[in-house]
């Protein structure tokens, strides 16, 4: 009996995905033809996630089931398939896979729904769905995977200058101030605390979609100030320690600043070091 029920649920889930596949083939049109084979394969692999996020699966009513038997809905089956597919995708590729899912959903929406000011609400809703997906699947899914916009050289230089306090703080080039009068019951801020405050203030002024690039600029600035031999080659013994130090500093920065900083940033294009892909649970 249970086998029959599970088969029925799987059939319902497959039907939902098949309906989605028809919609996708009609909705994508020319853009689907322009996709590379790897992107098409990812889209096929992520169709359960598209179906689940759009809630195109509907709960099945089975009154004949006993109350102690969990009544799985077709949505739960599709959710399971989605999580299973996500778990099979390498961590460094999940951000790209999620972009494809979001793009598929956007292209299936009517164009007017994605015009301002509705667009901002739609993206916020999508981000919340992806955060829930990360919790439900119990695997690492980037909280925010925003396509890294290409910034001009002048803009990148401005970002780097803006985040000079962060570079200083992460390198701990600020030294605590010696307080000659410890009896004064007023907290004497250290120079590091002042620089930390400046760093957080600068980060908060940078738009969310550019913070990942800004953080990479900070990491690049720190890298360039390290002895050159420590950064040569992809698998030098010194390199993991350097990257781990930066990763831990950025995690601390994320907590101290109390602002949104992407948990995972796309691999930087300015140098050959995969800050994310090298480490499990990758953070910037």
From Swiss-Prot:
Pfam families: Gliadin. CDD domains: AAI_SS. Gene3D superfamilies: Plant lipid-transfer and hydrophobic proteins (1.10.110.10). One of its GO terms (molecular function) is nutrient reservoir activity. Contains disulfide bonds. Residues 1-18 form the signal peptide. Keywords: Disulfide bond, Seed storage protein, Signal, Storage protein. Belongs to the prolamin family. Seed storage protein. Might be integrated via inter-chain disulfide bonds within the glutenin polymer. This is Avenin-like b6. It comes from Triticum aestivum (Wheat).
């Amino acid at each position: 009996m249970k086998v029959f029920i599970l088969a029925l649920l799987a059939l319902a889930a497959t039907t939902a995905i098949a309906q989605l596949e028809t919609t996708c083939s009609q909705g994508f049109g020319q853009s689907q033809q322009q996709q590379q084979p790897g992107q098409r394969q990812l889209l096929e692999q992520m169709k359960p996630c598209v179906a689940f996020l759009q809630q195109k699966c509907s709960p099945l009513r089975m009154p004949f089931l006993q109350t102690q038997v969990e009544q799985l809905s077709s949505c739960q089956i599709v959710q399971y398939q989605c999580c299973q597919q996500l778990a099979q995708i390498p961590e460094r590729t999940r951000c790209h896979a999620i972009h494809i899912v979001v793009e598929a959903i956007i292209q299936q929406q009517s164009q007017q729904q994605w015009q301002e000011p509705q667009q901002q609400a739609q993206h916020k809703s999508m981000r919340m769905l992806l955060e829930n997906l990360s919790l439900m699947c119990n695997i690492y899914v980037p909280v925010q995977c925003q396509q890294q916009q290409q910034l001009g050289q002048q803009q990148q230089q401005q970002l780097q200058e803006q985040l000079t306090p962060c570079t200083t703080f992460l390198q701990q080039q600020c030294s605590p101030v010696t307080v000659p009068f410890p009896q004064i019951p007023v907290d004497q801020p250290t120079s590091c605390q002042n620089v930390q405050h400046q760093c957080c203030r600068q980060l908060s002024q940078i738009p969310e979609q550019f913070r990942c690039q800004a953080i990479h600029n900070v990491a690049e600035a720190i890298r360039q100030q390290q002895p050159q031999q420590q950064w040569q080659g992809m698998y030098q013994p010194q390199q993991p320690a350097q990257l781990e130090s930066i990763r831990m500093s950025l995690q601390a920065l994320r907590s101290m600043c109390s602002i949104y900083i992407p948990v995972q940033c796309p691999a930087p294009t300015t140098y050959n070091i995969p800050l994310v892909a090298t480490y499990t649970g990758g953070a910037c």
